[in-house]
Each structure stands twice: as C-alpha cells, then as structure tokens.
From Swiss-Prot:
Cited InterPro entries: B12_transptr_BtuB, Plug_dom, Plug_dom_sf, TonB-dep_rcpt-like, TonB-dep_rcpt_b-brl, TonB_box_CS, TonB_rcpt_b-brl_sf, TonB_rcpt_CS
Gene symbol of the encoding locus: btuB
Signal sequence residues: 1-22
NCBIfam families: TonB-B12
Cross-referenced Pfam families: Plug, TonB_dep_Rec_b-barrel
Family assignment from sequence similarity: Belongs to the TonB-dependent receptor family. BtuB (TC 1.B.14.3.1) subfamily.
A single BP term in Gene Ontology: monoatomic ion transport
Span of domain TBDR plug: 41-154
Primary location: membrane
Subcellular location(s) of the protein: Cell outer membrane
Summary of the function given for this chain in its UniProt record: Involved in the active translocation of vitamin B12 (cyanocobalamin) across the outer membrane to the periplasmic space. It derives its energy for transport by interacting with the trans-periplasmic membrane protein TonB.
Membrane topology qualifier: Multi-pass membrane protein
Protein name as catalogued: Vitamin B12 transporter BtuB
UniProt keyword annotations, A-Z: Cell outer membrane, Ion transport, Membrane, Porin, Signal, TonB box, Transmembrane, Transmembrane beta strand, Transport
C-alpha cells in the first residue's frame, strides 16, 4: 500500500516512549491496536498515542504501574501513600473514572466502589502499554472521555525464552519473578509469568501521638498463563488466565489506632479465536473476571468485616476490512454483564450493556480521515449514542495539522447505583463533548507537536450531603488546555519533553479537586555500549484539595513539587543484567493527596538472567 505524505510525517512523530533506542535498530513501523480497535500502522491513525514497551519497563526499572504512567504526557498520579495504597490518575484533567482501562483490549473491571486502582495491577505480566489521549467513547463506550490505557500482557506473545529476575531495596522491599515463552509443537506457544513482591512500607497516614512508628506494608502474588495455537496462516485460537492477590495495610481512622488490612483478589479467564486474510480480520473473545475485596481489622481477621464481590463477563466481536489502498472499514459488537455482591447488606445487583460500533478510515495523498459511531443499550440507564470525527492534512513534509470532535459518556458505577445506603438507581450517565486541534512537525531534528483541547462535561456524578446519596450535578464542567511535546537527541542522549497547561473548572468556576494547572516532564535515555542510563523529571504545580479531618471540611492547597527518578542497567553478558534505581533522588517531601506523605528517597537493586 502506497503511503500518503501525511502518513509518512505521522510515522516520524508516533515513536514509542522507548526513546528511539540508540543501541538497536528500530522496527520499520510502529503498530498500534488501541487507537481504532484494530491493528494498524501508527502512521495511519490521527489519535495521539504513546507506547511503553517491555524494554522501557526494564530500562526504567519501574516497580509499579503508576511509576510508569506518570512519565506520560498529560498524566497526573494521585496516591494515598506508598506501594499498594490507593492510586488514581488524571488525564488532561479528567478523573480516573473518566479514563477507560483495558487489559488485552477488554475493559478491566472497576472496583465496585470506584475507579481502577492502578497500584493493584502487577507489572510482572505486562508486555506493552498503549496510551491514547482524547475521547474514544465512540469506539469503547463508557469512561473513554479523557483517554484509553490498554495494558497488553504476555499472554499472546510470540517471544521464546525465559527470564528470571530478583531484587531488593529500601523499606525491606523484595521481589522475584519469572517469565517464559515455550514452543508447543510446531504451531503452539505457551507463555507463563509468575511474580511475588513485598515491602514493609512506612507510615502512610502519620498522626502524631496516635500511630507513631506504624508501618503500612504491601504484598502481591501474581500469575499469568497463556496459550496460542496457529492452525494455519489464517486461523488461530488463544486462551489465557491471570490472577493476583494483593494485601496492603492502613490505619482505620484519623483519631484512633485501629490497624486495618485490605485484600484485593482478581481472577480472569479469556478464550478467543482470530481469522485473518489479506483484507479481512475477524476476532471473537469471551472473558470472565472476578474481583473480591476484603476490608478488615488486623486483630479480628479476614472474615470479621466487610467484603465485596464483583463479576464481569464480556463478549467482544471485532471485524476489519481493507477495501483498497484508501478505505478501511471496521466494526463490531460488545456485550457486558456486571454483578455486584454486597456481603455487608447481603444483596446482589446485576446489569448488562449491549453495544455496536463502526469505524471508517481513509488515507489519500495529503489527507487522513477517521469517523466512528457507537450505540450502547444499558438495561438500567437506557441508550447512549456517541460519535467522533477526525481530519488531518499535510501542508509540507515537515508540517501538518489535525483536528477532531466527538462525544463521550461515563456510566454510574455499581456502588453509586445500587448501594443500599448511598445508591441512586435514577442516576444518569455523565455526558461530554470534546474538541482538539493539533499542529506537528519536524524541525532541525526536533519532532514536536502542540495540541489544544476542550472538554465540556455535564451531569457529573457526586455525593450529595443533603440527600445523603449520589446525585447528578446540574451544570457544565469545562476542561481546556494546551499540550506541547518534543523529541530530539543530543549526542548519545535521547530526550522527551512535555508541557501540560490547563484550566479544569467545575460548574461554579472553581478548579476541580487535585488538578494541577501546570505540569512539565523530561525523560532521557543514555545508551552507551553495555550501559543504559534512564532519568525522569516531573514538575507538578499547586492543586486544590480538601482537609477531611476538620469539621466542616476545609479547602486547602497542596504545594507544587519536583520529582527526579533515575536508573542504570549494566549488561554484564548477553544473558545477565544488573540494574539499580533511585526513587525520589532529591528526597523531596510532598503529598499528592492531603495527609498522605509520599515515600522518602528509596534505593533498589535487581539482577536478571535470560536463557
């Protein structure tokens, strides 16, 4: 297929976050699957996509998913303390429950009482992460207002070999993992990943005179098993299972020393098949996911207090047809059923959602076009229709423009709808409109882009202290901002810069809680002979927050902070690597949530062996 001038220019801009690894040859084209729900060259999509590869995870020596995601453009992490504690994010000022999280292309079940807790997803079985900024509800449905994060596991990897990794670090941190890909006969591939990690933590919620000396630790055990069978060049079958058991500790209240533990268990199974010909690709997947959450006082034990169960079942059928060198059509059907069991109230709630979507993409000379439409039918809140259209034009080989406009929505979660005390079955989805305009180019070896975005969100769902339940807030919240990104090299150093400036206001014109108006990030990699040196810097400006330990609750402002992390990997041989990482290199004192100090400077050492 002959590529347009615009596609060639976009290909140079849509490089993975892997810093154009100076010590290895690059693939001819970066391929993405999340932008339009089918595999395509990055140069053929108008979406803003960033990619984290497994090599990036190894080079940065990140220990948690939030440590990786905070390097991405427009991402701001909020965390209630250290490893394992509740972690959420904002993308372009939209909240965690307005960002869709996928695992292998399937919606990850959200905790019944809120959004995805990013600290609970282990890195052991992560192979790649694709991050799409901007509304994508016309493809995926609910939650895809601010963007989509697709965590792609090793379940369908074709890479063979075994890697063993062991490490230790500050706060009595220990980790051990093994990942292996093995050929089964001539047409099969088995993938296995096992991991365990723990630390004793620190006092994530210090209250002088009440819990002095407390340490709030974390432990995670996780596993993945995947199998792929290629019957012939066109037809394949795949199946996988993944699980984790995470336990973390915290204090029950501000005024009493009531030590508590929370346990989060997750188990999922997937089976699917794919047919692929020269022009047509069709894939069918069936997935079931079960989550169990316990919250109990340590002295009384696991079954003394509350527990919640959440089950989610998905069927997904996606098709893509390449009409000719210009036009591509895609579409599919999604079905999801969710069950929430509240053990405290001894009640079970269930709802289902059926959806169909269609996409058309065109690539002709200096033009790129994308248009998508989706219809969702939910048994509780009715139907939603969302759309998106994007257009790009290349003026000259080194300069282009693209624009998009779309609609999106976020459905109430199961807790907000069904909780016996605080739920409201009459809640309606939040709805949003988004518009973006982007200029990009290549100048003197610098790849750059500047994007303006504007989100208008209505019917925000929030707790109402007067009615004592969740209600839709009347009025319109507005988030508008500008992003600037740049990639360039100075000698053997590869640089990535991003600037995010935004105003995120509620319907009364007040800044939305915990959103920073200014963020600056710099990521760099030095790859020289047998050594990789990675460094990451971020500045997060002042943010409004609430002090829940006062009555009535007081408005406060969290201080701005700068954070530096660095890591070094030394390749002793082709099979042995020794790595070290320092978190919070400058030992800054800061909070991303009021009353929850972040960890002090921490050191980590790791050794990996491949065979």
């Amino acid at each position: 297929m002959q590529k347009s001038a615009l596609a060639i220019a976009l290909a140079s801009l849509l490089t993975p976050i892997s810093y154009l690894h100076a010590n290895e040859a690059q693939p001819q084209e970066t391929v993405v699957v999340t932008a339009n729900r089918f595999e395509q060259k990055a140069s053929s999509t108008l979406a803003d996509v960033e990619i984290i590869t497994r090599q990036d995870i190894e080079q940065t020596q990140a220990k948690t998913l939030p440590e990786l995601l905070r390097r991405l453009t427009g991402v701001q992490i909020t965390q209630n303390g250290g490893r394992g504690q509740l972690a959420s994010l904002f993308v372009r000022g939209t909240s965690s429950d307005q960002v869709l999280v996928l695992v292998d292309g399937i919606r990850f079940a959200r905790a019944a009482k809120g959004a995805v807790d990013f600290n609970q997803i282990p890195l052991t079985y992560v192979d790649r992460i694709e991050y799409v900024r901007g509304a994508r509800a016309s493809l995926y449905g609910s939650e895809a207002i601010g963007g989509v994060i697709n965590i792609i596991t090793k379940a369908r990897s074709q890479q063979q070999g075994t890697t063993v990794s062991a490490g230790l670090g500050s706060l009595d941190y220990q980790e051990l993992s093994i990942a292996s890909g093995v050929a089964i006969g001539e047409k099969g591939q088995m993938n296995v990943a096992l991991g365990t990690e723990s630390d004793k933590g620190y006092n994530v919620r210090p209250v002088p005179g009440v819990n002095d000396g407390d340490r709030h630790g974390f432990r995670s055990d996780n596993a993945l098993l995947g199998y792929v069978h290629q019957f012939d060049e066109s037809w394949s079958l795949f199946a996988n299972a993944r699980a984790y058991e995470n336990i973390y500790q915290y204090d029950n209240s501000y005024g009493t020393r009531d030590y508590k533990e929370a346990e989060k268990d997750d188990l999922s199974f997937t089976i699917g098949t794919q047919y692929q010909s020269e022009r047509w690709v069709s894939e069918l997947q069936l997935t079931t996911q079960k989550q169990k959450s316990w919250d109990y006082t340590q002295s009384k034990g696991k079954y003394s207090d509350t527990s919640d169960n959440l089950e989610q079942r998905n069927i997904q059928w996606i098709n893509r047809y390449l009409v000719n060198d210009v036009w591509t059509f895609a579409g599919g059907v999604d079905w999801r059923d969710e069950s929430y069991i509240d053990k405290t109230a001894d009640k079970e709630f269930d709802r289902s959602n059926t959806a169909a979507f269609a996409v058309v993409a065109a690539e002709w000379q200096q033009w790129l076009l994308e248009a998508s439409l989706r219809f969702d039918d939910n048994q509780e809140y009715g139907s939603q229709t969302t759309h998106n259209i994007a257009l790009g034009y290349q003026f000259i080989p080194e300069f282009g423009v693209k624009a998009s406009y779309g609609s999106a929505f976020k459905a109430p979660n199961l807790y907000q709808q069904y909780d016996p005390s605080y739920g409201n079955v009459n809640l309606q989805p939040e709805d949003a409109d988004s518009a973006e305009l982007s200029f990009y180019g290549l100048f003197s070896g610098i790849k750059w882009s500047i994007t303006g975005y504007d989100y208008k969100i209505n019917n925000l769902i929030d707790y109402n202290s007067t009615t004592k339940n969740y209600q839709n807030v009347i009025g319109e919240s507005n988030i508008k901002g500008v992003e600037f990104t740049a990639e360039f090299a100075t000698g053997i150093v590869q640089h990535q810069l991003s600037v995010d400036l935004k105003d995120a206001d509620d319907s009364k014109g007040k800044t939305l809680q915990r959103r920073a108006e200014h963020m600056y990030k710099w990521n760099a990699l030095v790859a020289f002979e047998q050594v990789d040196w990675s460094i990451g810097y971020q500045y997060v400006g002042k943010r409004p927050d609430l002090d829940y330990n006062t009555y009535p609750t007081q408005n406060i402002t969290l201080d701005a902070y700068s954070l530096v992390d660095t890591s070094v990997s030394y390749y002793v041989t082709d099979s042995t690597t020794i790595s070290a990482r320092i978190d919070n290199l400058l030992d800054k004192e800061y909070e991303t949530a009021n009353g929850y100090p972040a960890a002090e400077r921490a050191y980590y050492l790791n050794i990996g062996y491949q065979f």
